[in-house]
Structure formats: structure tokens, C-alpha cells
Regions:
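C-terminal motif of bacterial Sec signal peptides marking the signal peptidase cleavage site
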Residues: 18-19
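Aromatic-rich peripheral "rim/lid" segments of glycoside hydrolase catalytic domains that contact
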Residues: 29-42, 316-337, 341-428
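Boundary/entry segment of secreted carbohydrate-active catalytic domains
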Residues: 25-74
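Conserved, mostly hydrophobic/aromatic
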Residues: 86, 166, 240, 305-307, ...
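Acidic-and-aromatic substrate-binding clefts and catalytic sites of carbohydrate-active enzymes
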Residues: 63-66, 87-101, 127-130, 142-145, ...
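Substrate-binding cleft of extracellular glycoside hydrolase catalytic domains
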Residues: 91, 96-207
Length: 428
């Protein structure tokens, strides 16, 4: 199958934007110290400050933490492609990843005063008995939550020029998170706690507080989520961080994924291209649904995307025997069309994610959760950013001593051999 001109223009155009931004910083940014410290209010919604979710784990277990030199290696790669704010997820003492990311950025800033990278610092929230052999109690919180929040406060105060946002919980209110979800009042309690610290001068007044959760948890889906505590939470946060995954819904809510009858005559590639156009419309609708509800509660509140992404390997629901959503071509279309939309509309999108992380489904190497990255664990650039490799954006950079190269050796025809037309007719 051949690349059509529209696809070439989309992928090349977005890559040129990133390339020009990166080369501008390479040519001019290295000579001057940053003239002002950016705030969350100035970063969010700013297309010059692209966002991404980041985990630097290289191995199949988080017990093997990436070193600070390895984190610096990754952060330089992300900086080169125009990323300026990273999202992390937890600050548990046995998992010092986030603290090490902050230290890595701090060191890079000392080495080069023009270096600019910020962090949305996540604090993990659990219910009682989460991740144990006991039945989770979703109406009672874990006694570890308060400690987690306090650790986040310590890091925000230690690195005030880097930490610009604290997110209380990750998908901590959505009911399909059956291992650990809590009720909205728990999130509200800690958001209010952090806001009070800001008022009392114990945290920067410019630090923004949010919670990052599924679109439904923010009132964009099932009306049963629309409770008083959620209304109060919407008023309490500085902005709403919502997650939206057309990729997963290709299996769980596939009405948009099915090839319409009036498109059955199209070529396979045209069917595939149209499927991603529908996926983008699905994403936009979830954003609109959240926005409509949130603004009915607080018209001043902004909504940004805390997570969305597209996996490139799956031996499960989304692979060849399932919805067939999974491959680098579809990831490329989704990523680039998504960035085009969010940049135009002033929506920050913490794209999920930077690098593949194989600890997420350690017993299943081809499980989709391991393969959401724009880069492989070896540092190979996937199809969405092949053009950045062509343009020399990553020249001189490496991951684990591997230079940044393209997946499939850059062979488009070989890649396309694995790209399948969307499927909804399979046993579920």
C-alpha cells in the first residue's frame, strides 16, 4: 500500500513543527539563560510547551530503577522533539523514579541554564486493601495516601522551578480500576489540603492542583458519577485533567470503530485512514462531554488531556484476533492528528507515552500495556516520529548506548504488512 499525499502532508507537517522548534532551541537557546520562570497557567494550553507521560523504566520490573544518567539521556531526547513538560505518577519511597526525574532535570539545568523542562508530579491514591489479597474497600482510603501527598509536597518545595502541577491520584475514581479506586471525597480532601498549603504560603501560589482521571470520572459519561463531591472537586481543582482512550474503546465501545456500510467499497488503506478520523472524533466528543459538564459547574475551569495514546503491539483484545487497532501506522495517524487538534485548540495533551515500559505486563511480552511508547525500550523511534529521525533531531543522542533509529529500519512497506482493517466481528 502506498502513502497518499494527505498522509505524507500530515506526518511531515507535524514533524516539521517539532523540528523547527527543536532546532530553534539548539541554535539560540543554548546561549541565554531562561528569562522567566513559567507557571502552570502559562504552560498548559501553550503549543510551544508540548506535554508527555514519562516512565524511564527499561526492565520488566520497577525494582530496577533507571539511573539518573539514564533519565537525563531520555529527557534530552524528549527535549529535542519539543517536549517541555513531563507527567509522572507516584512518589512512593520504594519507587524513587519521580524524585530522580526531578534531580535529573535539575542537573541538566545546572549544566545548561537555557535548558527548560517542567513536571506534572503525580501522587498515587489507593483505597484500603488495594493491591493485597484482601478485598479492596472502595469506601475507605489507604493510610498510605497522606504520606504520599506529603512526599509530593516535599518534592514540590525542593524543586519549585520544575514542579508546576501536582495531580492527586491517577484513574483513582473510575470504577473499572477495581484494584484501588476511591470515592471522590478522598480526592477532594487532598486537593483541598494542597490548596490550603498554597494559601498559607507552604506551597507556591502558582502551583496548580488537579486530579487526573478517566473522562467518565469527570462527569463525561455515566451520570452516576455526577455527585456532589465531584461538583465540589471540580470547583476545588485549578483545572481538570481527563483521560480518553479511543484505542481501548475499539473493543469496549466499538460503534465508532466498525467500518460503515457506505465505506465498504473503499480500499483497505482508506478504511484504515477513516477509522482514525473516527477515533479522533470519538476523542473530541469525550472532551466535549467532559467540558460541557465541568463548565456547567464552574464556567471558568479549563480542561486538558492528562492521558491518551495508542499501542503498537497487542496479542489481546486489540490485536489481529480482536479489534485490529494495534500498529504503528494507526498510532502515527492518531498521534499526529491529535497533536494538530489539541495545539490548535489550546489544549495540553500529556500523550501516553514517551517510551515503551515492559514492566506493565511483565508476564506477557506482547501485551498492549507494554507498547504505548513513541519509542521502543531500545530507543527506536516509531512511525509517528520517523520524520524527526530524518531531520536529524536526535543526532548525537542515544538510549542505552543505542543511537535513535527508526523501527522497521524505516521501511514503510514492511510496516504496512502488519496494518489491518478495523474489525468488530469477533468473540468477546
Amino acid at each position: 500500500m502506498k502513502l497518499n499525499l494527505k498522509t505524507i502532508a500530515l506526518i511531515t507537517g507535524f514533524s516539521i513543527v517539532l523540528a523547527c522548534t527543536s532546532h530553534h532551541h539548539k541554535k539560540t537557546g543554548m546561549k541565554h539563560q531562561i528569562s522567566k520562570q513559567m507557571t502552570a497557567a502559562e504552560i498548559l494550553g501553550n503549543p510551544n510547551y508540548l506535554a508527555i507521560s514519562y516512565g524511564g523504566y527499561r526492565e520488566q520490573s520497577r525494582s530496577i530503577q533507571p539511573s539518573i544518567p539514564q533519565l537525563k539521556e531520555d529527557i534530552k531526547i524528549l527535549y529535542a522533539m519539543g517536549i517541555r513538560i513531563l507527567r509522572t505518577y507516584n512518589v512512593q519511597p520504594e519507587l524513587p523514579h519521580a524524585a530522580n526525574v526531578l534531580e535529573a532535570i535539575s542537573q541538566l539545568k545546572k549544566e545548561d541554564p537555557s535548558f527548560e523542562m517542567y513536571v506534572m508530579l503525580g501522587a498515587w491514591i489507593d483505597c484500603l486493601h488495594a493491591w493485597t489479597d484482601k478485598t479492596p474497600n472502595h469506601d475507605v482510603e489507604s493510610d498510605q495516601n497522606e504520606k504520599e501527598i506529603k512526599r509530593a509536597v516535599v518534592l514540590a518545595n525542593k524543586y519549585p522551578s520544575i514542579v508546576k502541577i501536582i495531580a492527586v491520584g491517577n484513574e483513582a475514581m473510575v470504577r473499572w480500576a477495581t484494584s484501588y479506586y476511591v470515592q471522590p471525597n478522598v480526592i477532594l480532601k487532598y486537593v483541598n489540603y494542597l490548596q490550603n498549603l498554597k494559601k498559607n504560603g507552604e506551597l507556591s501560589k502558582d502551583l496548580w492542583i488537579t486530579s487526573s482521571d478517566d473522562f467518565s470520572s469527570w462527569g463525561g459519561g455515566d451520570f452516576s458519577y455526577r455527585v456532589q463531591d465531584l461538583e465540589d472537586l471540580i470547583k476545588a481543582v485549578d483545572y481538570v485533567s481527563m483521560h480518553t482512550y479511543a484505542y481501548h474503546n475499539s473493543h469496549y465501545n466499538p460503534s465508532f470503530w466498525k467500518v460503515p456500510d457506505d465505506q465498504l467499497h473503499l480500499s483497505d488503506k482508506q478504511k484504515i485512514d477513516r477509522s482514525i478520523e473516527r477515533a479522533i472524533e470519538f476523542t473530541k466528543k469525550q472532551y466535549r462531554d467532559v467540558s460541557e459538564y465541568v463548565k456547567s459547574i464552574d464556567s471558568s475551569k479549563t480542561i486538558h488531556i492528562g492521558e491518551t495514546g495508542w499501542a503498537t503491539t497487542s496479542n489481546g483484545f486489540y490485536g489481529a484476533n480482536g479489534s485490529r487497532a494495534t500498529d504503528e501506522y494507526k498510532q502515527g495517524l492518531y498521534h499526529n492528528q491529535l497533536r494538530e487538534w489539541t495545539n490548535k485548540e489550546g489544549i495540553s495533551c500529556f500523550y501516553f507515552e514517551a517510551f515503551d515500559e515492559h514492566w506493565k505486563d511483565a508476564q506477557n511480552a506482547n501485551g498492549s500495556e507494554n507498547h504505548f511508547g513513541l519509542f521502543t525500550t531500545k530507543g527506536e523511534a516509531k512511525f509517528p516520529i520517523w520524520n524527526l529521525v530524518d531531520r536529524g533531531i536526535f543526532e548525537g543522542l542515544s538510549r542505552n548506548q543505542h543511537p535513535i533509529t527508526k523501527t522497521y529500519d524505516g521501511d514503510y512497506e514492511t510496516l504496512m504488512e502488519e496494518v489491518l482493517v478495523p474489525n468488530t466481528e469477533y468473540d468477546r
